[in-house]
Amino acid sequence: MITFTEEYLILKTLIRMYDEALKKADPVLMLEISVDIAESAEKLEQLSCDHINGH
């Protein structure tokens, strides 16, 4: 299972990747990465809730 810290680092990396795609004006890559960002953010949210609830 991925830890909170690992998922946070994944999200940060994806955001950097999105920034690079934005600089290249690559809309297809931007869309693909934005989906990955949304999925990672959702995982991070769940890990945060689990942490708060002591799981």
Task: Show the residue positions of the predicted features.
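Short, charge-rich amphipathic interface segments used for partner binding and complex assembly
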Residues: 3-55
